[in-house]
Regions:
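Short, conserved active-site loop motifs that form the nucleotide-linked donor/cofactor pocket
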Residues: 196-198, 209, 290
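Intrinsic, low-complexity polybasic segments
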Residues: 18-21, 26, 30, 35, ...
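Intrinsic-disorder-associated, low-complexity terminal segments enriched in Asp/Asn/His/Tyr and depleted
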Residues: 43, 54-55
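Rossmann-like AdoMet
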Residues: 58-151, 155-205, 225, 363-366, ...
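Active-site flanking residues adjacent to catalytic metal/cofactor-binding acidic residues
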Residues: 149-151, 176, 211-214, 295
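A mobile, often basic/glycine-rich helix-loop segment
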Residues: 212-258, 307-317
Length: 423
């Protein structure tokens, strides 16, 4: 079933600077239709139900959380006492200077003692980026381009690994990132390649080349839908004194699939991620073309909206611990939701792109030669790289989808284990 009312615009926050407002307006300006049928061409734990928090979290960074909470309370009041979770999530993550991805708090790192909250694949092993570079190089050759684009580059580790591996095949590496703090860290990391790297905080009109996004889609705001007593509601956030609380309102929104049964059911829909893909498709097709590869945790639609997955997938991450309560410690922890890869594929196809393939991260990296790299590495290096493909870690939980303006070539990363037929 098509989510009704999908045209509703999510307001990111009244306090956005003009620059960030323009950036997000361009980033999420379109809502793709879900009226097409899929056609295929040529590390964080499982989610759980958001629960009412007790707001007892006290940390050295409580002042950031307190100021951000006040900003959100103001937004709730201005909206008449209720905002959708998508707006809450957007403010918690991206409110200028206060949101999780825009404040100066440490985020990425392998050890909680450093103050970090989680580690991503490039920080786990440089073999991740060096192996991904094989796919990027093939895509650059096929598309006849020489520019790589990365959304949400984190510490810059993946960019460094790709630039080190690709050499002269890349003339320019463009990072689109809204975080000034992370941008400074990226600049330090990428100093050896400074002559090739540039940063943008908004969409360009044209994108030519190869786009990569590692754990980008999961951080895009989602809407929460709750079925209670057979009636669908949108779950939003209200003020409860100094705290936040959940409040459900009847809605015409529906999940894209009919959920069997009459049991209570919590899930998400992803208009922001689908609009992002549609905007990307428009810009790739405005120039000479290109390809895009997104790596993230998620499922095909049939798995995402399985009747037994009744608690949703929204999760938070702080100091390498996961919890299911986004209403506490706002600005101090990451908020994510799993990716509906069927929705991504349909959004791409409806906008004119081809699906090159869809598979697990393990198959993708093994197809690109990770096993051969590991055979030449030290025991410690092999141990770290093994986590990238271990079935019980990143290997199966994380998936990869490839998109391109042309579907008449076979992307090496999907040679074996392609699951496009499951989308």
């Amino acid at each position: 079933m098509i989510p009704r009312g999908i045209e509703r615009v999510v307001i990111i926050g009244d306090g956005l600077t003009a620059r960030l407002r323009r950036a997000y307006a361009r980033l999420w300006e379109r809502r793709p239709r879900r009226d097409g049928q899929l056609q295929t061409a040529g590390h964080r734990p499982e989610g759980g139900a958001p629960t009412q928090g007790d707001n007892r979290c006290v940390t050295p960074t409580a002042s950031i959380s307190s100021e951000l909470a006040q900003r959100i309370h103001q937004a709730i009041a201005q909206a008449g006492g209720w905002i959708g979770f998508d707006r809450f999530m957007a403010m918690a993550l991206y409110e200028p200077g206060l949101g999780y991805y825009t404040n100066a708090l440490q985020k990425f790192g392998a050890m909680p003692s450093s103050g970090s909250d989680f580690v991503t694949a490039p920080g786990l092993s440089p073999m991740f980026g060096h192996t991904l570079a094989v796919q990027v190089q093939q895509a650059l050759q096929v598309t006849g381009t020489s520019e790589v684009w990365e959304f949400g580059a984190g510490t810059g580790a993946l960019a460094l690994q790709l630039l080190d591996s690709l050499g002269d095949a890349v003339a320019r590496y463009t990072i689109i990132d809204l975080s000034g703090t992370l941008r400074a860290r990226q600049a330090d990391t990428l100093a050896p390649h400074a002559h090739k790297v540039r940063w943008l905080d908004a969409w360009p009109e044209v994108i030519e080349g190869v786009v990569v996004g590692n754990e980008v889609l999961d951080a895009m705001p989602v809407q929460l839908l709750q079925r209670t007593g057979g009636v669908w509601h949108e779950r939003g956030v209200v003020s409860a004194g100094e705290k936040f609380a959940w409040q459900d309102r009847p809605t015409d929104f529906r999940p894209p699939l009919e959920i069997e049964g009459e049991h209570d059911y919590l899930t998400e829909i992803h208009p922001q991620a689908e609009a992002f893909i549609a905007s990307l498709a428009e810009r790739l097709q405005a120039g000479r073309g290109g390809a895009a590869f997104f790596l993230d945790y998620g499922f095909p639609e049939a798995e995402y909206f399985h009747p037994q997955r009744h608690m949703g997938t929204v999760m938070c991450h702080q100091l390498h611990q996961a919890d299911a309560d986004p209403l506490v410690a706002v600005g101090q922890k990451d908020i994510t939701a799993h990716v509906n890869f069927t929705g991504v594929a349909l959004a791409a196809q409806n906008a004119g792109l081809h699906v090159l393939g869809y598979t697990s991260q393990a198959w993708f990296l093994l197809n690109l030669g990770l096993a051969e790299r590991m055979a030449q590495a030290s025991l410690a290096e092999r141990s770290q790289a093994q986590r990238l493909v271990n079935e019980h870690e990143m290997g199966e939980l994380f998936k990869v989808i490839g998109l391109a303006t042309s579907g008449d070539w076979a992307a090496q990363g999907f040679d074996r284990g392609d699951r496009s037929h499951r989308l």
